[in-house]
From Swiss-Prot:
Keywords: Flavoprotein, FMN, NADP, Oxidoreductase
Binding positions (FMN): A53, P54, L55, C56, A88, Q130, R264, G370, R371
Induction of the gene: Highly expressed under trichothecene-producing conditions.
Taxonomic lineage of the native organism: Eukaryota, Fungi, Dikarya, Ascomycota, Pezizomycotina
Species in which this protein is naturally found: Gibberella zeae (strain ATCC MYA-4620 / CBS 123657 / FGSC 9075 / NRRL 31084 / PH-1)
Cofactor: FMN
SUPFAM superfamilies referenced in this protein's UniProt entry, alphabetically: FMN-linked oxidoreductases (SSF51395)
Enzyme class: oxidoreductase
Coiled coil stretches, renumbered: none
Protein name: NADH:flavin oxidoreductase FG08077
Protein backbone atom coordinates (compact mmCIF):
# COMPACT_ATOMS: atom_id res chain seq x y z
CA UNK A 1 0.00 0.00 0.00
CA UNK A 2 1.33 3.44 -0.92
CA UNK A 3 0.96 6.19 1.64
CA UNK A 4 0.77 9.88 1.03
CA UNK A 5 3.93 11.52 2.30
CA UNK A 6 2.92 14.11 4.89
CA UNK A 7 5.79 15.69 6.77
CA UNK A 8 5.70 17.82 9.91
CA UNK A 9 8.03 20.34 8.28
CA UNK A 10 10.72 21.93 10.44
CA UNK A 11 11.11 25.66 10.94
CA UNK A 12 13.87 27.05 8.75
CA UNK A 13 17.07 28.21 10.39
CA UNK A 14 16.41 26.82 13.87
CA UNK A 15 19.30 24.86 15.43
CA UNK A 16 16.80 22.34 16.82
CA UNK A 17 13.61 20.76 15.57
CA UNK A 18 10.40 22.72 15.96
CA UNK A 19 7.44 22.67 13.56
CA UNK A 20 7.21 25.50 11.05
CA UNK A 21 4.52 28.09 11.81
CA UNK A 22 2.99 29.29 8.54
CA UNK A 23 1.22 31.63 8.95
CA UNK A 24 2.64 32.73 12.30
CA UNK A 25 0.59 32.74 15.47
CA UNK A 26 -1.36 35.98 15.85
CA UNK A 27 -2.41 36.11 12.19
CA UNK A 28 -6.11 36.86 11.66
CA UNK A 29 -7.72 34.07 9.62
CA UNK A 30 -11.35 35.20 9.66
CA UNK A 31 -13.22 38.38 10.51
CA UNK A 32 -12.03 41.97 10.28
CA UNK A 33 -10.50 44.01 13.10
CA UNK A 34 -7.91 46.75 13.42
CA UNK A 35 -6.20 44.88 16.27
CA UNK A 36 -5.37 41.98 13.99
CA UNK A 37 -4.56 43.99 10.87
CA UNK A 38 -0.85 43.58 9.99
CA UNK A 39 1.46 46.57 10.06
CA UNK A 40 4.75 46.96 8.17
CA UNK A 41 7.61 49.12 9.47
CA UNK A 42 10.79 49.49 7.36
CA UNK A 43 9.83 46.38 5.45
CA UNK A 44 9.30 44.32 8.61
CA UNK A 45 5.73 43.00 8.79
CA UNK A 46 4.09 42.37 12.14
CA UNK A 47 1.01 40.09 11.99
CA UNK A 48 -1.08 42.23 14.33
CA UNK A 49 -1.04 45.51 16.27
CA UNK A 50 -1.11 44.11 19.80
CA UNK A 51 2.51 44.38 20.96
CA UNK A 52 4.06 43.05 24.16
CA UNK A 53 5.48 45.93 26.20
CA UNK A 54 8.85 45.46 27.94
CA UNK A 55 8.51 43.89 31.38
CA UNK A 56 11.42 43.96 33.84
CA UNK A 57 11.80 40.56 35.48
CA UNK A 58 14.68 41.30 37.90
CA UNK A 59 15.96 37.78 37.28
CA UNK A 60 19.35 38.17 35.56
CA UNK A 61 22.78 37.26 36.91
CA UNK A 62 25.46 39.91 36.31
CA UNK A 63 23.39 41.21 33.41
CA UNK A 64 23.06 37.78 31.78
CA UNK A 65 19.55 36.65 30.82
CA UNK A 66 18.54 33.29 32.30
CA UNK A 67 16.14 30.44 31.57
CA UNK A 68 13.45 32.49 33.32
CA UNK A 69 13.63 35.06 30.51
CA UNK A 70 13.51 32.36 27.83
CA UNK A 71 10.53 30.54 29.30
CA UNK A 72 8.64 33.65 30.40
CA UNK A 73 8.98 35.34 27.03
CA UNK A 74 8.72 32.09 25.11
CA UNK A 75 5.28 31.34 26.51
CA UNK A 76 4.05 34.70 25.28
CA UNK A 77 5.94 34.74 21.98
CA UNK A 78 4.57 31.38 20.83
CA UNK A 79 1.03 32.74 21.26
CA UNK A 80 1.48 35.54 18.76
CA UNK A 81 1.87 39.18 19.83
CA UNK A 82 2.58 41.37 16.82
CA UNK A 83 5.94 42.20 18.41
CA UNK A 84 7.50 41.01 21.67
CA UNK A 85 9.89 43.34 23.50
CA UNK A 86 12.64 42.26 25.90
CA UNK A 87 12.77 44.26 29.11
CA UNK A 88 14.81 47.41 29.84
CA UNK A 89 18.37 46.27 29.14
CA UNK A 90 21.22 48.26 30.65
CA UNK A 91 23.88 49.71 28.37
CA UNK A 92 26.23 50.21 31.33
CA UNK A 93 26.84 48.06 34.40
CA UNK A 94 25.89 50.90 36.76
CA UNK A 95 22.88 51.75 34.58
CA UNK A 96 20.80 48.84 35.84
CA UNK A 97 17.68 49.51 37.89
CA UNK A 98 18.52 46.58 40.17
CA UNK A 99 21.49 44.21 40.43
CA UNK A 100 19.29 41.59 38.73
CA UNK A 101 18.60 43.54 35.51
CA UNK A 102 19.51 42.30 32.03
CA UNK A 103 22.43 44.05 30.35
CA UNK A 104 24.21 44.39 27.00
CA UNK A 105 27.35 46.21 28.10
CA UNK A 106 29.64 43.29 27.20
CA UNK A 107 29.83 40.71 24.42
CA UNK A 108 29.23 37.72 26.70
CA UNK A 109 25.67 38.90 27.29
CA UNK A 110 24.79 38.36 23.62
CA UNK A 111 24.52 34.57 23.73
CA UNK A 112 21.80 34.25 26.43
CA UNK A 113 19.69 36.79 24.53
CA UNK A 114 20.34 34.97 21.27
CA UNK A 115 18.57 31.93 22.71
CA UNK A 116 15.45 34.09 23.01
CA UNK A 117 15.67 35.58 19.51
CA UNK A 118 16.37 32.15 18.03
CA UNK A 119 13.23 30.78 19.64
CA UNK A 120 11.17 33.76 18.49
CA UNK A 121 12.35 33.38 14.91
CA UNK A 122 11.74 29.61 15.01
CA UNK A 123 8.10 30.53 15.63
CA UNK A 124 8.10 33.09 12.77
CA UNK A 125 7.73 35.85 15.36
CA UNK A 126 9.36 39.29 15.62
CA UNK A 127 11.27 40.40 18.70
CA UNK A 128 12.80 43.65 19.91
CA UNK A 129 14.88 44.86 22.84
CA UNK A 130 14.63 48.03 24.90
CA UNK A 131 17.97 49.71 25.65
CA UNK A 132 18.10 51.71 28.84
CA UNK A 133 20.07 53.42 31.59
CA UNK A 134 18.46 53.97 34.99
CA UNK A 135 20.41 57.10 35.91
CA UNK A 136 19.47 58.28 39.40
CA UNK A 137 16.97 55.41 39.72
CA UNK A 138 19.76 52.81 39.59
CA UNK A 139 20.88 50.43 42.35
CA UNK A 140 17.39 49.75 43.71
CA UNK A 141 16.07 46.45 45.04
CA UNK A 142 13.41 44.44 43.21
CA UNK A 143 9.95 46.03 43.54
CA UNK A 144 8.39 43.13 45.43
CA UNK A 145 10.93 43.73 48.21
CA UNK A 146 10.42 47.47 48.70
CA UNK A 147 8.81 50.53 47.14
CA UNK A 148 12.00 52.55 46.81
CA UNK A 149 14.82 50.96 48.82
CA UNK A 150 18.42 51.29 47.70
CA UNK A 151 20.41 48.13 46.90
CA UNK A 152 23.42 48.24 49.21
CA UNK A 153 26.91 47.08 48.25
CA UNK A 154 26.36 43.94 50.35
CA UNK A 155 23.67 42.76 47.91
CA UNK A 156 25.49 43.78 44.73
CA UNK A 157 24.36 47.40 44.58
CA UNK A 158 26.44 50.49 43.75
CA UNK A 159 24.94 53.35 45.82
CA UNK A 160 28.20 55.32 45.55
CA UNK A 161 28.28 55.18 41.75
CA UNK A 162 24.88 56.53 40.73
CA UNK A 163 24.88 59.12 37.94
CA UNK A 164 22.37 61.61 36.54
CA UNK A 165 22.20 64.81 34.49
CA UNK A 166 22.31 66.84 37.72
CA UNK A 167 23.18 66.08 41.33
CA UNK A 168 19.55 65.78 42.42
CA UNK A 169 18.30 62.67 44.22
CA UNK A 170 15.21 60.83 43.01
CA UNK A 171 13.74 61.35 46.48
CA UNK A 172 15.60 63.53 48.96
CA UNK A 173 16.58 61.65 52.10
CA UNK A 174 15.76 58.27 50.56
CA UNK A 175 17.89 57.89 47.42
CA UNK A 176 21.57 58.81 47.14
CA UNK A 177 22.52 62.12 45.57
CA UNK A 178 23.88 61.12 42.14
CA UNK A 179 27.04 62.34 40.49
CA UNK A 180 26.32 64.81 37.70
CA UNK A 181 27.42 63.67 34.24
CA UNK A 182 30.56 65.27 32.88
CA UNK A 183 30.94 65.91 29.15
CA UNK A 184 33.22 62.87 29.02
CA UNK A 185 30.54 60.79 30.76
CA UNK A 186 27.99 61.84 28.15
CA UNK A 187 30.29 60.83 25.30
CA UNK A 188 30.85 57.47 26.96
CA UNK A 189 27.11 57.04 27.45
CA UNK A 190 26.40 57.69 23.78
CA UNK A 191 29.07 55.23 22.70
CA UNK A 192 27.74 52.60 25.11
CA UNK A 193 24.19 52.96 23.76
CA UNK A 194 25.62 52.44 20.27
CA UNK A 195 27.71 49.45 21.34
CA UNK A 196 24.67 47.86 23.00
CA UNK A 197 22.58 48.41 19.86
CA UNK A 198 25.25 46.70 17.75
CA UNK A 199 25.28 43.77 20.18
CA UNK A 200 21.50 43.61 19.95
CA UNK A 201 21.76 43.23 16.17
CA UNK A 202 24.35 40.48 16.63
CA UNK A 203 21.96 38.80 19.06
CA UNK A 204 19.33 38.69 16.33
CA UNK A 205 16.83 41.35 17.40
CA UNK A 206 14.49 42.71 14.75
CA UNK A 207 13.69 46.00 16.50
CA UNK A 208 15.57 48.43 18.77
CA UNK A 209 13.72 50.56 21.32
CA UNK A 210 15.30 53.49 23.19
CA UNK A 211 13.94 53.98 26.72
CA UNK A 212 13.38 57.69 27.37
CA UNK A 213 10.52 57.31 29.85
CA UNK A 214 9.52 56.44 33.41
CA UNK A 215 12.06 58.66 35.10
CA UNK A 216 15.13 56.79 33.85
CA UNK A 217 18.24 58.51 32.56
CA UNK A 218 17.12 59.82 29.17
CA UNK A 219 13.85 61.04 30.69
CA UNK A 220 15.98 62.69 33.39
CA UNK A 221 17.73 64.67 30.67
CA UNK A 222 14.38 65.66 29.13
CA UNK A 223 12.70 66.88 32.31
CA UNK A 224 13.55 70.15 34.10
CA UNK A 225 12.60 68.37 37.33
CA UNK A 226 15.84 66.38 37.14
CA UNK A 227 17.91 68.34 34.62
CA UNK A 228 19.26 71.63 35.93
CA UNK A 229 22.40 71.73 33.82
CA UNK A 230 23.67 75.02 32.42
CA UNK A 231 25.61 73.62 29.46
CA UNK A 232 24.38 72.49 26.03
CA UNK A 233 22.59 69.50 27.62
CA UNK A 234 20.36 71.53 29.94
CA UNK A 235 18.12 74.55 30.13
CA UNK A 236 16.23 75.01 26.87
CA UNK A 237 14.02 72.38 25.26
CA UNK A 238 16.54 72.00 22.44
CA UNK A 239 19.34 71.37 24.91
CA UNK A 240 17.40 68.89 27.04
CA UNK A 241 16.50 66.71 24.05
CA UNK A 242 20.03 66.87 22.64
CA UNK A 243 21.47 63.67 24.13
CA UNK A 244 18.41 61.64 23.09
CA UNK A 245 18.78 62.78 19.48
CA UNK A 246 22.54 62.22 19.48
CA UNK A 247 22.07 58.64 20.71
CA UNK A 248 19.40 57.96 18.09
CA UNK A 249 21.60 59.42 15.33
CA UNK A 250 24.52 57.19 16.31
CA UNK A 251 22.37 54.07 16.38
CA UNK A 252 20.45 54.84 13.19
CA UNK A 253 23.74 55.40 11.40
CA UNK A 254 25.22 52.04 12.39
CA UNK A 255 22.41 49.46 12.48
CA UNK A 256 20.76 48.04 9.34
CA UNK A 257 18.44 50.43 7.52
CA UNK A 258 15.75 47.74 7.75
CA UNK A 259 15.78 47.71 11.57
CA UNK A 260 12.95 49.81 13.04
CA UNK A 261 13.78 52.16 15.91
CA UNK A 262 11.14 52.81 18.57
CA UNK A 263 11.37 55.44 21.31
CA UNK A 264 9.40 55.16 24.54
CA UNK A 265 8.61 58.51 26.14
CA UNK A 266 6.75 59.68 29.21
CA UNK A 267 4.34 62.16 27.67
CA UNK A 268 4.07 64.08 30.93
CA UNK A 269 5.48 64.19 34.44
CA UNK A 270 1.83 64.82 35.46
CA UNK A 271 2.70 67.93 37.45
CA UNK A 272 1.19 70.26 34.84
CA UNK A 273 -2.32 69.04 35.68
CA UNK A 274 -2.32 69.51 39.46
CA UNK A 275 -2.01 72.94 41.12
CA UNK A 276 -0.49 71.40 44.25
CA UNK A 277 2.40 69.83 42.34
CA UNK A 278 2.70 72.64 39.83
CA UNK A 279 3.69 74.96 42.67
CA UNK A 280 6.36 72.51 43.82
CA UNK A 281 7.52 71.68 40.29
CA UNK A 282 6.90 74.86 38.25
CA UNK A 283 8.90 73.42 35.34
CA UNK A 284 8.45 69.82 34.23
CA UNK A 285 8.17 67.65 31.13
CA UNK A 286 4.78 68.26 29.51
CA UNK A 287 2.57 66.91 26.74
CA UNK A 288 3.30 70.00 24.68
CA UNK A 289 7.03 69.25 24.81
CA UNK A 290 6.41 65.58 24.02
CA UNK A 291 4.43 66.53 20.92
CA UNK A 292 7.26 68.83 19.85
CA UNK A 293 9.83 66.05 20.38
CA UNK A 294 7.66 63.53 18.54
CA UNK A 295 7.59 65.82 15.50
CA UNK A 296 11.40 65.88 15.50
CA UNK A 297 12.05 62.15 16.04
CA UNK A 298 11.12 60.88 12.54
CA UNK A 299 13.66 63.31 11.06
CA UNK A 300 16.27 61.29 12.95
CA UNK A 301 15.07 57.91 11.71
CA UNK A 302 12.62 56.97 14.45
CA UNK A 303 9.70 54.86 13.24
CA UNK A 304 7.38 54.66 16.25
CA UNK A 305 6.85 56.71 19.41
CA UNK A 306 5.49 54.71 22.34
CA UNK A 307 3.57 57.03 24.66
CA UNK A 308 3.67 56.26 28.37
CA UNK A 309 3.88 58.70 31.31
CA UNK A 310 5.25 59.53 34.75
CA UNK A 311 8.16 58.19 36.76
CA UNK A 312 10.33 61.29 37.16
CA UNK A 313 9.63 61.67 40.89
CA UNK A 314 7.71 59.63 43.50
CA UNK A 315 5.07 62.36 43.60
CA UNK A 316 4.28 61.88 39.92
CA UNK A 317 2.77 58.51 40.88
CA UNK A 318 0.41 60.36 43.22
CA UNK A 319 -0.57 62.79 40.47
CA UNK A 320 -1.45 60.03 37.98
CA UNK A 321 -5.15 59.25 37.70
CA UNK A 322 -4.83 55.62 36.62
CA UNK A 323 -7.70 53.69 35.09
CA UNK A 324 -8.66 51.85 31.90
CA UNK A 325 -6.63 53.23 28.97
CA UNK A 326 -5.56 56.14 31.18
CA UNK A 327 -2.68 57.16 28.89
CA UNK A 328 -4.53 56.88 25.59
CA UNK A 329 -5.54 60.55 25.53
CA UNK A 330 -1.84 61.44 25.76
CA UNK A 331 -1.11 59.19 22.78
CA UNK A 332 -3.96 60.80 20.85
CA UNK A 333 -2.49 64.25 21.45
CA UNK A 334 0.87 63.05 20.16
CA UNK A 335 -0.72 61.40 17.12
CA UNK A 336 -2.61 64.57 16.30
CA UNK A 337 0.66 66.51 16.42
CA UNK A 338 2.67 64.12 14.23
CA UNK A 339 0.03 62.93 11.76
CA UNK A 340 1.44 60.28 9.45
CA UNK A 341 5.08 61.32 9.92
CA UNK A 342 5.66 58.67 12.59
CA UNK A 343 3.70 55.79 14.10
CA UNK A 344 2.32 56.14 17.63
CA UNK A 345 1.50 53.42 20.14
CA UNK A 346 -0.59 53.60 23.30
CA UNK A 347 -0.04 51.63 26.49
CA UNK A 348 -1.51 51.43 29.98
CA UNK A 349 -4.75 49.80 31.13
CA UNK A 350 -5.65 48.40 27.70
CA UNK A 351 -6.85 45.08 29.02
CA UNK A 352 -9.75 44.07 26.77
CA UNK A 353 -10.05 43.38 23.09
CA UNK A 354 -12.89 45.85 22.64
CA UNK A 355 -10.89 48.62 24.31
CA UNK A 356 -7.86 47.85 22.14
CA UNK A 357 -10.02 47.97 19.01
CA UNK A 358 -11.57 51.27 20.10
CA UNK A 359 -8.12 52.81 20.66
CA UNK A 360 -6.89 51.72 17.24
CA UNK A 361 -10.07 52.85 15.49
CA UNK A 362 -9.48 56.31 17.01
CA UNK A 363 -6.28 56.66 14.97
CA UNK A 364 -3.57 55.18 17.19
CA UNK A 365 -1.34 52.82 15.17
CA UNK A 366 -0.40 50.17 17.77
CA UNK A 367 -1.51 49.14 21.27
CA UNK A 368 0.84 47.62 23.80
CA UNK A 369 0.12 45.54 26.87
CA UNK A 370 2.51 44.51 29.62
CA UNK A 371 0.96 43.27 32.85
CA UNK A 372 -1.99 41.74 31.04
CA UNK A 373 0.34 39.51 29.02
CA UNK A 374 2.10 38.66 32.26
CA UNK A 375 -1.22 37.63 33.76
CA UNK A 376 -2.38 35.84 30.61
CA UNK A 377 0.24 34.77 28.02
CA UNK A 378 -2.68 33.88 25.75
CA UNK A 379 -3.91 37.47 25.60
CA UNK A 380 -3.85 37.47 21.79
CA UNK A 381 -6.39 34.64 21.64
CA UNK A 382 -8.42 36.20 24.46
CA UNK A 383 -8.72 39.50 22.57
CA UNK A 384 -9.65 37.63 19.38
CA UNK A 385 -12.37 35.71 21.23
CA UNK A 386 -13.78 38.96 22.62
CA UNK A 387 -13.84 40.51 19.15
CA UNK A 388 -15.36 37.43 17.53
CA UNK A 389 -12.57 36.75 15.06
CA UNK A 390 -10.27 33.80 14.44
CA UNK A 391 -6.52 34.08 14.78
CA UNK A 392 -3.89 31.47 14.06
CA UNK A 393 -2.20 29.95 17.08
CA UNK A 394 0.92 27.80 17.12
CA UNK A 395 0.13 24.46 15.45
CA UNK A 396 0.79 22.58 18.69
CA UNK A 397 -1.98 24.61 20.36
CA UNK A 398 -4.29 25.37 17.44
CA UNK A 399 -5.20 21.81 16.44
CA UNK A 400 -6.65 21.00 19.86
CA UNK A 401 -9.28 23.70 19.35
CA UNK A 402 -9.89 23.37 15.61
CA UNK A 403 -9.58 19.62 15.29
CA UNK A 404 -7.26 17.24 13.46
CA UNK A 405 -6.17 18.08 9.93
CA UNK A 406 -7.79 21.51 9.90
CA UNK A 407 -4.62 23.43 9.10
CA UNK A 408 -3.90 21.39 5.98
CA UNK A 409 -0.36 20.35 5.11
CA UNK A 410 2.39 21.10 2.70
CA UNK A 411 4.32 18.44 0.87
CA UNK A 412 7.97 18.14 1.75
CA UNK A 413 10.25 19.79 -0.80
Amino acid sequence: MAYEIIDNIAAEGAPYYTPAQDPPAGTQTSGSTKVFTPITIRGVTFPNRLFLAPLCQYSAKDGYATDWHLTHLGGIIQRGPGLSMVEATAVQNHGRITPQDVGLWEDGQIEPLKRITTFAHSQSQKIGIQLSHAGRKASCVSPWLSINAVAAKEVGGWPDNIVAPSAIAQEAGVNPVPKAFTKEDIEELKNDFLAAAKRAIRAGFDVIEIHAAHGYLLHQFLSPVSNQRTDEYGGSFENRIRVVLEIIDLIRGEIPETTPILVRVSATDWFEYDAQFKDEFPESWTVEQTCKLAQILPKHGVDLVDVSSGGIHPKSAIAIKAGPAYQVDLAKQVKKAVGDSVLVSAVGGIKTGHLAEEVLQSGIDVVRAGRWFQQNPGLVRAFANELGVEVKMANQIDWSFKGRGKNGHKKSP
